[in-house]
């Protein structure tokens, strides 16, 4: 089977197969780059490509065959062509593998490294949103999401390190409201050293997630730099959106700066803001805080 997809002669089939991958989302440009860089690997039935608690962080796209996902020696799911495996460790390189992945049949996979994924993500930022959607579905599969109703609304604030000033301003303006505002760096995540387990714990606790796009964040789109949320901000907002729903996952974006969002973020609740660190900071930011406050109070806690 691997011969069919190998070399220049097999490139058309590689591109076709990769275009159909969930993380690729039909993007032929992304599929073509993947076809050039990915390593094709033939896997025999019973062979293991990922070992639970392993420290590798490659990402695998399933081209043919099927793979069992095994946690603590118990098979829990089966993945098929179009699926990918290894996303969690690829997104958080210091995290150990959370499951074993073994071939249920003779299979073919395309492997890329974490570094290659990061490089692709800088050119095709939609891949982070798609990955977040897939991981959200897998979190739902675990069926651990029944929470007791909270007495106090909890609002979790996502941002890049560069936008922490905006996050802290929002927290201070909500100091006397009947809800708790928690920026990501205050006892939730450690800077540049958190895992998806940390995110999942916060998913279970919060009623709203507010992601702050910052004008200093940029991405390169067709050779032009555009303001855009950082990859981790888009990724985390996608996870919270998958759990909480679009009304409870809110994006705050700088007013008038033409922020570029992944195309499949359409429909996310957005609130524009003005942040002037030097002049009338609270007065200029106030309308955005008021709009967000009204939105939060209208929905309340999750039942």
UniProtKB/Swiss-Prot annotation:
Pfam families in the cross-refs: CAP12-PCTIR_TIR (PF10137), cNMP_binding (PF00027)
Any single Gene Ontology cellular-component annotation: cytoplasm
Enzyme Commission identifier(s): 3.2.2.5
GO molecular function list: NADP+ nucleosidase activity; nucleotide binding
A single GO BP: defense response to virus
SUPFAM superfamilies: cAMP-binding domain-like (SSF51206)
Originating organism: Burkholderia cepacia (Pseudomonas cepacia)
Keyword check for Protein transport: no
Coiled-coil intervals: none
Gene3D superfamilies: Jelly Rolls
Binding residues annotated for a nucleoside 3',5'-cyclic phosphate, in chain numbering: 22-138
Protein's UniProt keywords contain Protein transport: no
Keyword field: Antiviral defense, Cytoplasm, Hydrolase, Nucleotide-binding
Activation and inhibition: Activated by cyclic UMP (cUMP) and to a lesser extent by cCMP.
InterPro entries the UniProt entry points to: CAP12/PCTIR_TIR_dom (IPR019302), cNMP-bd_dom (IPR000595), cNMP-bd_dom_sf (IPR018490), RmlC-like_jellyroll (IPR014710)
Known partners and oligomeric status: Purified protein forms large 2-dimensional sheets when incubated with cUMP and shorter filaments in the presence of cCMP.
Record's subcellular location: Cytoplasm
Transmembrane segments: none
Task performed by this protein: Pycsar (pyrimidine cyclase system for antiphage resistance) provides immunity against bacteriophage. The pyrimidine cyclase (PycC) synthesizes cyclic nucleotides in response to infection; these serve as specific second messenger signals. The signals activate the adjacent effector, leading to bacterial cell death and abortive phage infection. A clade B Pycsar system. The effector protein of a two-gene Pycsar system. Upon activation by cyclic UMP (cUMP) degrades cellular NAD(+). Expression of this and adjacent uridylate cyclase BcPycC (AC A0A0J5ZXG5) probably confers resistance to bacteriophage. The genes are probably only expressed in response to bacteriophage infection. This protein probably only responds to cUMP (produced by its cognate NTP cyclase).
Domain of life: Bacteria
Protein name: Pycsar effector protein BcPycTIR
């Amino acid at each position: 089977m691997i011969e069919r997809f190998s070399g220049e002669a097999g490139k058309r089939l590689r591109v076709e197969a990769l275009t159909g991958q969930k993380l690729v989302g039909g993007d032929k440009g992304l599929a073509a780059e993947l076809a050039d860089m990915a390593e094709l690997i033939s896997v025999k039935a019973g062979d293991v490509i990922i070992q639970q608690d392993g420290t590798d962080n490659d990402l695998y796209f399933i081209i043919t065959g099927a793979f069992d996902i095994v946690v603590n020696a118990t098979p829990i799911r089966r993945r098929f062509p179009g699926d990918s495996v290894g996303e969690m460790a690829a997104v958080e390189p210091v995290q150990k593998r959370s499951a074993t992945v073994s071939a249920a049949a003779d299979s073919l996979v395309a492997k890329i490294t974490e570094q290659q994924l990061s490089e692709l993500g800088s050119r095709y930022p939609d891949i982070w949103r798609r990955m977040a959607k897939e991981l959200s579905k897998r979190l739902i599969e675990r069926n651990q999401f029944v929470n007791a109703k909270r007495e106090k609304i909890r609002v979790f604030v996502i941002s890049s390190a560069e936008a922490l000033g905006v996050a802290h301003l929002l927290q201070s303006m909500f100091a006397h409201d009947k809800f708790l505002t928690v920026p990501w760096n205050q006892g939730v995540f450690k800077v540049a050293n958190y895992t998806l387990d940390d995110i999942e714990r916060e998913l279970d606790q919060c009623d709203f997630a507010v992601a702050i796009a910052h004008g200093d964040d940029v991405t390169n789109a067709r050779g032009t730099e555009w303001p855009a949320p950082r990859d981790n901000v888009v990724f985390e907002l996608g996870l919270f959106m998958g759990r909480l729903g679009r009304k409870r996952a809110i994006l705050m974006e700088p007013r008038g700066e033409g922020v570029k969002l992944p195309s499949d973020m359409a429909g996310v609740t957005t609130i524009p803001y003005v942040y002037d660190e030097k002049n009338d900071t609270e007065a200029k930011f106030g309308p955005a805080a008021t709009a967000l406050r009204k939105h939060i109070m209208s929905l309340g806690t999750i039942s």
